């Protein structure tokens, strides 16, 4: 195994850290750090469900996600998506991935008639923002569900399992785990994998 630019071996993760209660108002909030990538993941709870659920009499609650990179998250300033009329294709794909992944971890019927909004705001992007959003979103979601349960708003624990994600790729013919931006942009092949605990 060769050593990478940041000193890691090819099968080594970047340092991972979750800073709880990074934001005061949401039901659950963490700063997810994967090396130099930092994503603020916050879960807000709204006591209603989407109209389509009401119209179709779907029991339980819903979980959805929003994802965006802040203008200063990359060396070259990124225009806010709200200034461009809404999320672009990349952000839309990522927020769908985060939402679908986290819905796998929760019994939505046990959530009751509520919507859990998982907001993922990228503060610093150095590769792996999808994976950091899923992992940070999972930690923030668990915090939020515990608070709802402690407040007597949930009769059972809706958390069925935990989920995590990691990237992998082939760079200059070598398989690597947890790609930083420099590696990701040079990768011949890359993928993001999610995993549920059993």
Regions found by a protein language model. Give the residues of each.
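Structured core elements
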Residues: 17-19, 31-33, 40-42, 64-66, ...
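Glycine- and Gly-Pro-enriched alpha-helical subdomains that act as flexible
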Residues: 128-156, 160-187
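Short, Gly/Pro- and small/polar-rich lid/capping loops
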Residues: 1-26, 33
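Flexible, glycine/charged-enriched surface loops at secondary-structure junctions
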Residues: 2-8, 15, 108-115, 150-158
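Glycine-rich, flexible beta-strand/loop modules in the N-terminal catalytic cores of phosphate-handling
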Residues: 29-111
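Glycine-rich, charged/polar anion/phosphate-binding loops
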Residues: 16-19, 25-30, 48-51, 104, ...
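A short glycine/serine-rich beta->alpha loop
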Residues: 82-87, 120-129
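Conserved small/polar residues in nucleotide/adenosyl-binding loops
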Residues: 194-198
């Amino acid at each position: 195994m060769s050593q990478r630019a940041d000193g890691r071996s090819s099968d080594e993760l970047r340092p991972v850290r979750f800073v709880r209660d990074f934001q005061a108002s949401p039901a659950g909030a963490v700063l997810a750090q994967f090396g130099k990538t930092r994503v603020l993941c916050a879960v807000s709870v709204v006591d209603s469900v989407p109209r389509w659920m009401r119209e179709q009499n779907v029991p339980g609650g819903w979980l959805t996600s929003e994802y965006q990179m802040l203008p200063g998250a990359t060396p070259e300033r990124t225009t806010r998506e709200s200034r461009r009329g809404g999320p672009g294709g990349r952000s839309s794909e990522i927020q769908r991935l985060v939402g679908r992944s986290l819905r796998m971890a929760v019994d939505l019927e046990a959530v009751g008639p509520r919507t859990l909004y998982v907001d993922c705001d990228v503060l610093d992007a150095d590769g792996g923002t999808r994976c950091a959003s899923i992992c940070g979103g999972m930690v923030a979601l668990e915090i939020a569900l515990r608070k709802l349960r402690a407040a007597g708003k949930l009769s059972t624990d809706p958390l069925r399992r935990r989920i995590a994600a990691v990237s992998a790729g082939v760079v200059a013919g070598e398989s690597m785990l947890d790609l930083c931006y420099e590696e990701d942009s040079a990768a011949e092949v890359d993928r993001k994998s999610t995993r549920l605990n059993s």
